[in-house]
């Protein structure tokens, strides 16, 4: 086995490119530990008893600074603590995601001549893979071999996770094959690591294949494995396969969690299967799986999409009663639902509640309100909301301007829209084709067809291409003025530019 591992390791190292000197972990001569200045025998005794007391009490609730302080006490203790104690501490710091710190502390241990265990090296390998470049992981793998350690499945799974972290999918797949070739039996962590990576990068067929292999290789998937697949399938619209997986995991007595249910609920909402989403929510509650902010957000969004606004509001308040507090996205979703249904005052009530609860409205929230007021024929109030934005740390973006301009034009306030458009041009704002199309339409409504066509022609010099809506708007403007020849010429140019006319061109 050792020989096959060594051969496999050699081929893995060959796959790395950038072996630079600065990336290598230096393992110094243990004798240099003698040069470290210590503070005397009494200090050693105090430090020794102090760190032992902390270790006895457990490291679960240890804060980062306390962990560093504990390491300092441990290295100043005499005799030095066992490598098991050091390994436990490194593991705790690694769980805090302070990977560079773990690597640095390990280097200090090497200087002090504290010989590591294989599990110590595996913790460091995990940290190297999540904080550094591939070449450093290769270097550390070589150091492990020099120290006499034969990398095990945990080592290679960490390296596999590193490849996934660096988005090197082909290398991850190749390493997985090498792991099999070296005689290792991948466990659920190894499989799940690669499956999650494949799903994230939309290689779903390969991920499903790998999932099916697990049973034949004697590795049982867990809820994390299922969640990776369910989420990946839902993201590409394969909700039927995802629902089958949910049934499969329940048959195997693997309990789905909030991530499993939320992925499917969100997928059902997106494909218009609101009833199925609500049924799944009820199953979730019956199984005592508590919804989170994402679950509630998906359901509220679905209810708003179907105009079930009072039910959406009930779900919103139920969420609060259950101790799950809405964020600005959920507030905005509900406000948008009310505004879209012309219930702007109800939307404003939610907006005021949002402010009272200390949730800060963002640019999208204000844009939704502006659109709502324009929709109910109150463009002046919409402009008041617009004017408040900058002072409330939610500066308007191009979409906000477009919504306001469109609302003003649709409500007969074209001159005001033109003034705002002129202001945007003077400020050299990043005006897009939607903005120009709105203004061209507004000009045509005012009878300023020549000005509209001048603006239309200027688009090409600005490096901006009209879309089918821009063409249709301009053609309609010509037709309303009886300029049939000009409309026909523009219609031909539209087809030359590769745009297929829509039904509004023929009206």
UniProtKB/Swiss-Prot annotation:
InterPro entries linked to this entry: Pentatricopeptide_rpt, TPR-like_helical_dom_sf
Disulfide feature: none
PROSITE patterns, per the entry: PPR (PS51375)
Keywords for this protein: Mitochondrion, Repeat, Transit peptide
PPR repeat residue numbers: 47-81, 82-116, 117-151, 152-186, 187-221, 222-256, 257-291, 292-326, 327-361, 362-396, 397-431, 432-466, 467-501
Localization in the cell: Mitochondrion
GO cellular component, one term: mitochondrion
Transit peptide: 1-48
UniProt keyword annotation of Phosphoprotein present: no
Family, as annotated: Belongs to the PPR family. P subfamily.
Protein name: Putative pentatricopeptide repeat-containing protein At3g16710, mitochondrial
